[in-house]
Amino acid sequence: MKPVFVILFLTCIAFTYAESYEDVKEEIKNEVEREIFEDLEEESDVLDSNVREFNDAKPWRFRRAIQRVRWRKVAPYMPFVVKTVGKK
């Protein structure tokens, strides 16, 4: 809710000090763009830190190896493996 109140406050200031409607529109647009860029920078910093933590974790190696398996290539051989294991 804070960004909403900030934008509304800046809008009120813009209305009181603006010379024309076009100036108000331009000022609001600039403020909104600035807020969006700041939020994106913060989110990218958070994502970068999460990626580093995930890549540094050694216990995840097995899970990543399983995720990399091409299941479409392996799936046709699964019934044969199940039959072979079931016979023993």
From Swiss-Prot:
Official protein name in the record: Arminin 1c
Free-text function comment from the UniProt entry: Antimicrobial peptide with a broad-spectrum antimicrobial activity. Keeps its antibacterial activity under a wide range of salt concentrations that mimic physiological conditions of human blood, which is surprising, since Hydra is an obligate freshwater animal with nearly no salt tolerance. Does not affect red blood cells.
Main subcellular location of this protein, as a coarse class: secreted
UniProt subcellular location: Secreted; Target cell membrane
Expression sites (tissue/organ): Expressed in entodermal epithelium along the body column.
Gene Ontology CC terms, in alphabetical order: extracellular region
Keyword Membrane: yes
Keywords annotated in UniProt: Amidation, Antibiotic, Antimicrobial, Immunity, Innate immunity, Membrane, Secreted, Signal, Target cell membrane, Target membrane
Residue numbers of Valine amide PTMs: V85
Signal peptide as annotated in the record: 1-18
Domain of life: Eukaryota
Record family assignment: Belongs to the arminin family.
Statement: the UniProt record of this protein carries the keyword Signal: yes
